[in-house]
Structure formats: C-alpha cells, structure tokens
Amino acid sequence: MDKLKIIFIAPLPPPYGGIANWMAMLSRYISKEKASKIAYSIIDTSPKKRVTEGRGLLQRVVGGFVSLIKTSFELRNELGRGNPDCVHITTSGSLGLMRDRAVLRMLSKRKINSVYHIRFGRVNKLLKLNNWEGKLLSYNLKLAANIIAIDGDTYKCLTEFGFGDKSYYVPNCINLKELPESSIIKEKIISFIGWVIPAKGIGELVQAWKEISVEISKEWKLEIIGPYSKEYIDTFKIQNSDNISFVGELEHNKALEHLNMSSAFVLPSYTEGFPNSVLEAMALGTTVIASDVGAIPQMLSDGCGIVVKAKNVVELKDALVKVMTENISGFGNRALEKVKSEYEISKVVEQYIRLWRKNDVI
C-alpha cells in the first residue's frame, strides 16, 4: 500500500503553545512509529511575535495578511509536487480564519480532502452571534471536507448548525513515552504554565492566592511559568511574603519537570479549547484546578480534577485551599488512568488516519 501523503497547516515552536506543541509531538510520533505508512510535510503558521510582546490590532491584521499570502504560496508549491491524500488544517479562530478561507477554497476547487481541526472553544458563541468572525467560520465549515471538534459541546454545536454529517469528536492526545515518570513525591508547589496574560485568569489567580490566610499558604509556593511582560506583572505589586514566583518561559521539557514536582496545576482561563497543559498534568498524576471552559469539564469529569467557574475568585481560592489542606492524590491517580484509556497518542492518531483516508470529496 502506498504511503499516505499528508500536508499539515499548523504552527511549530517556537514560540511554545498548545497547538505548536501538539504539531511537534505528532510529527515526532509519525516519524518514529508511522514512517512506513505516512509521508508528511508541515506549513508552519506560527506568529513571528508573541502575544506578550504587545501585538496591537494593526500588527495582527498585517501579520494575518502576511500569513495568508505565505501559507497560500507554500501550499501551491506543495500541491505542484502532486496532490496529497489530505491537508490537515488547525485553526484557533480570529484573524486566522481569513487564511483558513483561502486554503479551504483552494482545496475545494481542486477536490482535495481536507480536515479542519478546530482548536478553540468559542464556536457556539460565534455561530450564534453571526458577526464577521462567525460568518467566516461558517463559510469555512461549509468548505471543509471533514471537521474535527475537540470537545463534546463544539461537536454538539456543529451538529445543530447542520455540519453533523462531516463532523467528528476527536480529543487531543499525548505521547506518554515522551513524558517523565510520574513523581510519587510532590512538593508544596502549585504551578501555572501558559501565556501570562489577562485572558488566562492571571489576575484572578494572584488575587485568590493573596486572599488565602498566611497560616495555610506560608509553606506553599505559586509558580507562574510562561512568557510575560514586566509591565503586566508589575501591576500585581507582588511582595516576597506572597510566595509567588514569575518564572518566565522555559523549554518544554523543563516546564514538564516543574509540573511533575508540583502538587497541583492551575489554569483559570477565560477560554480554552482542549489544553495540552491540562493533559500533561493529568498524565503526570498532578492534580488539576481549571476553569469550566472548552473541553476542560469533560477532561476532568469522573473525579479527575477540580473545575471552577471562570473569573470566579472565590471558587478558585476554595480550590487552592483544598489542595493545600486535604489529601488530593486521588485526583491525579484517576486522571492518569483516564489519559491512558482515552487520550494516548496511538489511539487518537488512528482516528486521524481514518479521516485522512477519506476521499469522497464533493
């Protein structure tokens, strides 16, 4: 049987981020485990400037236009060498939808199989609002041959809006072979890993931490790991006595080391898709506290973590106190078993392959 030929349109690190890390992990897995069956190339869509470096609206519009031109040019070159079995497109919405539109139109005209992999959690809101972003998303969904939803709510929404016949629920995945062995002994550390920006709930996290009584928190440390702007963290007026450390950006393996030795991982985001950081914490047996957005409630169901309302300081504080004062090992143990049964990369990739093999493009 001939090799499957796949073109991925997705970001690669650096900078490190959920979709970029997924693409890097998937490419390593295919190269090592599926090299005899799959040939692939990647058109890198990673931004040249970080979120924390002050990308204003004009810069994002210009950057989006440049990405559209660059991606279209590279895709035409790839297609000039022969049609692939599938083009797998990841999307995080917003201005990137314009690039997706150009790509999907090109593939539709050439009758090339496509997988449109939705990696953000605002689909229901956008399709109901039907604003410029919602209209673009709807247009792209019509053009796509196959659509991947990474959470149950998004899949349900796609079905309600008439895309159910070509939509599939496929969760994110993790390669357990690439992770360190889960640490049995956890330190009195609670970690955040991600972009240090307001939308990740950093303000609520710092406020909740400061409201915990010193008697409870004095032996504990909050580590906030990820790229940040000094101007932003200066607004929190952190004191040494607060036991809060802004670590900055770390290489992925170093961040995993911090996560592995932490008693808990916290992600109080306003919006998420299917966060890799939560998946990694679960796979390391680290208790997760995260907001009720995107796929998180589904991931942490069945006692696999603690779910709090987004932007709710009181619930976040109570969850932090629970971690500090109770035996929480059961959360991590159950989460690890769930990862093994539902999210291990070999199982998820087989679902991708079934979509890549589909050739009934209209």
Question: Which stretches of residues belong to each language-model region?
Answer:
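Conserved acidic donor-binding segment of nucleotide-sugar-dependent glycosyltransferases
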Residues: 302, 306-313, 322-327
